[in-house]
């Protein structure tokens, strides 16, 4: 499998940002497809997650439970700023939120946010809260490494797949996450940790993608996120894919989503080399 370790980014490049419960390896098919179109790619891990899926499933670093949104975004900002030309940013779920936060800081040449966790000002739906319950319930969850039970993965991520496909996806990809991360997301309206300047006219182009059947980040949340940018003159586009769940980047037909992203990038920035 590919390493998620940061490597030198040279232009043009794409930085793939994973979300909660996933590792950089979840982006492998997308990286291969983008590289086939001429892009260089890298998928840096969140702090404490630069290990194999097997290692993370069996022995996660306990410090990971106290990792917050600010630390993760700062880590990506440092990685990107040490490189040369600003890269393209692609993120899923929390990764999609991080893409927006980074672009708002002036980091990145363009961004693609897929089923993004909501920035401040976008209220989570009932299903999003339900999807978070296994993480936030339990004494001390604020500072602990937390798991997503298989039944919650079935319900919130892969409900259109067969049970054998669901089990295989869970066993091969799902890792623990930070409890603090989810508390910050659910309390986002009370703090500025996920605040985005929706009127930032200098922001790089942004494509926001939703999955019609997503239960974890419902379509209405993604559309509300997109509409928040209505008063900005910066390019902001929206696309909803029918039949897609929160597993949109890996479920059958993911190639259509990736190709739409590639075509959008070609339109915004010019063709890849």
What are these regions, as identified by a protein language model?
Residues 107-141, 181-189:
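Flexible "cap/lid" loop of the alpha/beta hydrolase fold
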Residues 215-224:
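Conserved alpha/beta-hydrolase "acid-adjacent" motif
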Residues 7-55:
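Short, surface-exposed "cap/lid" segments of acyl-processing enzymes
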Residues 90-95, 99:
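Gly/Ala-rich beta-loop-alpha elbow adjacent to hydrolase catalytic centers
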Residues 202, 208-210, 214:
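Short beta-strand/loop motif that positions the catalytic acidic residue
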Residues 19-22, 93, 212:
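Active-site glycine-rich loops that stabilize anionic/oxyanionic intermediates
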Residues 70-87:
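Conserved acidic catalytic loop of the alpha/beta-hydrolase fold
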Residues 235-273:
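Catalytic active-site module of serine/aspartate enzymes centered on a nucleophile-bearing elbow/loop
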